Regions:
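Non-catalytic connector elements of ABC transporters
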Residues: 1-72
Length: 72
């Protein structure tokens, strides 16, 4: 698949470093070239349908209306 245009401004290229599968939702950690980790929570079904595996190159797309913040 080739993306020719998209309206999401915040995009991070990276490589999947870890996938924590849950029964319904899974966490996917993507490491950017600068070493930052972007974590996405998506459905486990989407992980399977997208063929996501550790080591796969991906693009994380972040829409401002879908960003959550947690304390650490």
């Amino acid at each position: 698949m080739t993306i020719t245009a998209i309206n999401v401004r915040n995009q991070f290229r990276g490589q999947i470093r870890e996938i924590i599968d849950g029964p319904v939702l899974s966490e996917v950690d993507v490491e950017t070239p600068s070493g930052q980790i972007v974590t996405s929570v998506i459905t486990t079904r989407s992980v399977k349908e997208l063929g996501l595996v550790v080591g796969k190159e991906v693009i994380a797309l972040v829409k401002a209306t879908e960003v959550s913040i947690a304390t650490i």
